Amino acid sequence: MALEKIIEKLENEKKVKIEELRKKREKEYEDFVAKKEKELEEWKEQQRKNLKESLNREESTLLSQLRLKYNTEKARIEAETVNRVKLLLLEKIKSLSNELYNGIWDGFVEKESVKGGEIILAKGEDKIDVDHFCKKYGLVLGKDRVEGKGGFVIQKDNLVIDLTIDTIVEELVNKNILEIAQILRGEK
């Protein structure tokens, strides 16, 4: 009987030890699973963060590209509009009556205080009263023509005064470019 009790006691101790080991292994397994789940969640969160940063960078790059494209197109349209304004202004000046047209050039020449020299007409010039300018300002008509849609150049010694329509319109636009840009952008 004593042997049976010893065997029974050993069996009980064995069951207790097995149960303790099972619980210990179960706890280790649960801890391992919890640790791995936590690592997985941290990895997922890091991947989300990386993806979000990557998307933000791509979005920022795309927005920058779109802004650049928009600003380039806007600048192109503004430049095209300014060129159209220049052409329209040139056409309006050329369509003035001969009296008004010559009066404009009289004003420019008087402003420059020209006395003497050579008047060289622009290739596109066909309305200037050359005789009037030659007599009034002591000018001599040059044989050649300069590039331009109208007007002329006065040359005396080393001095050249460019009074072509192209130059005058260009200077007028350049002088007022800020105001023109504000009008084009609807700021005025």
Swiss-Prot record:
GO BP, one annotated term: proton motive force-driven plasma membrane ATP synthesis
Alphabetically ordered keywords of this record: ATP synthesis, Hydrogen ion transport, Ion transport, Transport
GO cellular component: proton-transporting two-sector ATPase complex, catalytic domain
Record bears the keyword Ion transport: yes
Alphabetized InterPro entries for the sequence: ATPase_V1_Esu
GO molecular function, one term: proton-transporting ATPase activity, rotational mechanism
Family: Belongs to the V-ATPase E subunit family.
Role this protein plays: Produces ATP from ADP in the presence of a proton gradient across the membrane.
Name recorded for this polypeptide: V-type proton ATPase subunit E
Organism: Dictyoglomus turgidum (strain DSM 6724 / Z-1310)
